[in-house]
Amino acid sequence: MNIAKSIHFLSNKEALDKRLDRGLLGIRGRQADELSSLGLPVLPSVVIDATVSRSLYGEKLRSALSPYLRKFTLLNRKEYADAKNPMLLKVVLSPNLAISNYPVLHNFGLTRDTFAGFAERVGEHFATHEVFFLLKGVFGVLLGIAESEENTKGASEFVETLKEIEVFLQGGKSSPSGREAMNRYRALLPDGFFDDAYVQLEEAVRLVSKLLSFEEDGEDGVAILIQPMVYGNYGGGSYSGRFFSRNIITGEKKLQGQYFEERFDECDAEGSDVNAIKPAYLKQLQDIAWKLEDHSREIREVRFTIEAGSLWLIEQKPVEAKSTISLVRLLLDLYEREVVDAEYVVKSVKPGQLNEILHPVIDMTSVTGLKSSQGGIIGVPGAAVGRVYFTADSLIEAWRVAKMGGQDTRCILCMPATYAGDVKAIEVATGVLSNEGGYSAHASVVARQYGKISLVRPDMKIYSDKAVVDGMTINEGDFVTLNVPYYGESTLYMGAAQLIEPDPETSGLVSFIELAKGFVRSFHVRANADSPHDAELALAFGAQGIGLCRTEHMFFKEDRINVFRRMIFSENAEERTGSLKQLQKMQGEDFYGIFKVMQGHEVTIRLLDAPLHEFLPHGESEVSKFLEYLEKVCGKGLSREELQERISMLSEVNPMLGHRGCRIAISYPEIYAMQVRAVFEAVYRLQKEKISVYPEIMIPIVMNCRELKQIVYGKKIEGHAYQGIGSIEEEVRLALKAKEVDYKVGAMIELPAAALSADEIARYAQFFSFGTNDLTQTTLGLSRDDFNTFMPDYTMYDLVDGNPFAILDARVRELIEVAMQRGRLARPDIQLGLCGEHGSRSENIRFCMEVGLDYVSCSSYSVPIALLAIAQAEIENAEKEGRKPAWRGRSSAKSGGRRAR
């Protein structure tokens, strides 16, 4: 058989024929060809392609291979079969499938004649090790052949031989010398195997070919590669090493890895920083790294060997375990140098991955030795360290003491579940650890809003002063570390780890989001923000307004909660008015700050939604503190018994569907009136400062149009007059002698009844915002805080399609569409949005865009995620329509204002 046409040669100086079918080379062959075409210092290769690779057993190969071995000598400065400076070879199988189980064959050319010359350069011990490594590969092939031929006796003998060789390789017992090993296994090998290096190579290739011949119906297109071996311990000027093309945590464009001087195997060895290698070699390694990055558009892991001054690229592969920061910084670097365009950059990052950039990550070297427990439900990804406290009050007290004493203020709130009264603790905590609920539970939603970490551990038992998980006890005041990655298993560590803090600027997040925003058209993202700080963060992350300002969160601040409680428990209008004036001034300052930060953008203020039940003092400690406050402020107060009686009267069995939202406005009109006055006082104050403000007032938990009509326009019945928003605005405007501003009043659609009567509600609402957390609860009859207790069973029996508090349920989607259609029939220009944590998920965003909503609103920390999801949806839609996606962003610096390729 004439095999010459099926043998090919490649090196960094000699490329393969372009007409050659690359499918015949296998994966490794194609990679070697690709790298050689880049001019990288790859090992030269003889490639026996797939047309003959299974048919070489019995063929004379020496004459066909010898010319190529001489080419190896010219490049490698060593000669095959030379006694003094022998070149050794490896035989590599190159299948077309990435997953294969072929043995690796190294060190051909080690014979009785060449062993001494090789040992003189690398040492007797290492040379002997390489003999055993050669034997391991060959006997692996022989075992495969014996099993294919159903030669049970031969297979058994090879299995025992391989076991013995493995013991020698692992140093389990005193091994024979290299020459003794050649004699020891001589009878099991082809004749002359250790007598003639050319016979050895020829027999090795034949055996590999024979092994492949048994797989005619299996692996398709396996090539055989022959390459020279190079060693990092081959005398002076020899090194080995491994590195990443840039830092895989920070993304800094600097090699990250180690090198080893005069060593071949880096295992169990302490290396030196690769950047400290000789400058000439460092320059070569940098050129290799960044050529690979530009070509693959990925961070690469590179293994190299420098043998007697010559540098060789041994292996390169993508890096799976890298941070999102490193990926983003790589993409931005490629974009600035016009290697990729903005579209490629935006498509290369999954929206959820941005969570990692927005929160701290653990320095994994700092958790060695810490006890840990894996598992749990992701509330908010990231990492948090802090001392554990089991009530909001105990956490706040510990935080205050630590702050005053200049000590570590990091705290983690650990409770079964959290409620509105716990928000003040979440705000100062670094994270929340709970055992009820999941992604959409109150603890997770609030933590997300404040940029905190949240982990739910259903298997954790929480007591009054301790928690137990996986047999580990967490006492109050103990340090723990929460590691909640975007992908992979969450981990709870006992003790404090070191954290790497995020920086939106240096991480590249701000620049990345600017590129993504270039693809965003009319559909946009707003933020849920309750303070000027939240508003600033929202703008920094690319929000185009505030879609939800939860005013009840403002009342839970420490200096306000007792004022609000005093208002609730007031016995007469005079007392209540005094408290409301205090609250109005406080809220007015909040609104002023938020409007000022968001000048030029819409700000949606949701009037009080939380039930009064949530503002009541709970537990003996809160009751005592409130009684002390009343005594101090009023000079007199309620008795404990009177207070407990009033608390009982106001307590509700099911507050989520009870006295909340617009229902409070009907029963306590002065509360909403106070809030509306605070809004417009802030608006007209800013008007005098020449600052543009676009206020939107949203009424929550609307059930029918009559509720909204009364709140907006007021109502008079015999003996009663209800003042509407319009009348209050006019009152404030006239008192301040201001010019009327445009404002909108809208309804939060979070009940099926509201969705179905949207046409009637739209007569009085200029916008709808779909509150999908409550709409999901009221549509499906599910509690978001309790769903996870039975969700595993429902998932096991395939009774639900995923988590409806993460991905919108089909029936909730239908209600949204019905409400949109009916609302637009009544008011064609009605503005439509969705607020809540559903708004940051790609699947939900695509739905909102498809059905024609105008925006989504989510926590400030979710804004970049939502923007990226929108940009990717716009790109995908353009591709489906066969057009180039419209992009209105900044071109790379190199392009001088032109759009990058």
Curated annotation (Swiss-Prot):
Substrate binds at R550, R606, E750, G771, T772, N773, D774. Residues 523-901 are annotated as: C-terminal. Its EC number is 2.7.9.1. SUPFAM superfamilies: Glutathione synthetase ATP-binding domain-like, Phosphoenolpyruvate/pyruvate domain, Phosphohistidine domain. Residues 381-482 are annotated as: Central. Homodimer. Catalyzes the reversible phosphorylation of pyruvate and phosphate. The N-terminal domain contains the ATP/Pi active site, the central domain the pyrophosphate/phosphate carrier histidine, and the C-terminal domain the pyruvate active site. This is Pyruvate, phosphate dikinase.
